[in-house]
Structures are given as structure tokens and as C-alpha cells.
């Protein structure tokens, strides 16, 4: 199935003034309601990474789990879950970050990675980059490296992809939106 960025964009619902006034939230749930669109998204990522040399997939809580788990299954890679604060039961590492809405913490089990591991980080969207930057810092604290940061959507005007690239982390997104695009 050939990737069609327009087809994907047409299924991402803009929700005006959510979660606060002035924000256009990019709702990806319609992608998951369409088997064709979900297959298109999953296959696009799988085809990009099928022959690449990394050891783990790291998925961001919560929407990153949806696509990250599919890709981990398709590529037969271990899946590392980067969770919101207070959700993991064992020893954790935590990292604070700023979002477009405020401040938050992301956590990962301290034994998730070993020195020398290489991780593909996956999320639904790159906005300010806060979540993925925090996850990258956690990966590095465990002695591993970030192979690439990937998402379905990029909001380049918020600078997250550029911040990741400035850290030496390549980025890949299936589509992008301007902040005012509906």
C-alpha cells in the first residue's frame, strides 16, 4: 500500500480550542478507526525501519503506545514504555520537561536498557519536543543511544524537531501541520 500524506492528513481531526483556547489539537483517533489508514501508517514506519540497525522501540505515553506497539511487533523488537509520572511499579528513572501546556515528568523502568542499546523513539506528534527530549535524556542516562525520533505528525513551528536535531537526534514524521492549518 503506497503512502499518501494527504490521505493521512485528511483523517487527522482538528479540535479547535482544546485543551485550552488558541490550541488546535490534532486528534489521531480517526486513523485508528480506519483499518486502511492504520495499516498505511504502520506499514510506512515498518518499511522505513525494517532493515535499520537499532535494538529497541521506545514508545511515549499514551498515544505513542498505539503505533509503537504495532511497529515493535512488526519488526520483532523489544518495546520500552516511557510513562507519565507514577504509572510504573518498579525502580524508575524520571526526567522533567516542559510541554506546550505546562510541566510534566516522564519515567522509564531503570532496567529497560543497557549500555550500547540503540532506541527508535516513537510518539504520535512532535510539538515542542519536550516528551521526546526527556525520553532521549533517559535513554542516554542508561548508557544507550537514540537511533531516531519518529512521529505521525510534526508541528515544525513549535520547534521540537529542530531541538531534537540540535541534540544530534534525527527525526522522521509522516506528515506535518502549520499551527493555523485546519
From Swiss-Prot:
GO terms for biological process: adenine salvage; AMP salvage; purine ribonucleoside salvage. Homodimer. Signal peptide: none annotated. One of its GO terms (cellular component) is cytosol. Coiled coil: none annotated. It is found in: Cytoplasm. This is Adenine phosphoribosyltransferase. Its main location: cytoplasm. InterPro entries: Ade_phspho_trans, Adenine_PRTase, PRibTrfase_dom, PRTase-like. It comes from Pseudomonas fluorescens (strain ATCC BAA-477 / NRRL B-23932 / Pf-5). HAMAP family: Aden_phosphoribosyltr. It holds the Pfam family Pribosyltran. Its EC number is 2.4.2.7. Belongs to the purine/pyrimidine phosphoribosyltransferase family. Catalyzes a salvage reaction resulting in the formation of AMP, that is energically less costly than de novo synthesis. PROSITE patterns: PUR_PYR_PR_TRANSFER. It comes from the Bacteria. The gene is apt. Pathway: Purine metabolism; AMP biosynthesis via salvage pathway; AMP from adenine: step 1/1. One of its GO terms (molecular function) is adenine phosphoribosyltransferase activity. The keyword ATP-binding does not apply. Keywords: Cytoplasm, Glycosyltransferase, Purine salvage, Transferase. The keyword Repressor does not apply. It is an enzyme of class 2 (transferase). It catalyses: AMP + diphosphate = 5-phospho-alpha-D-ribose 1-diphosphate + adenine.
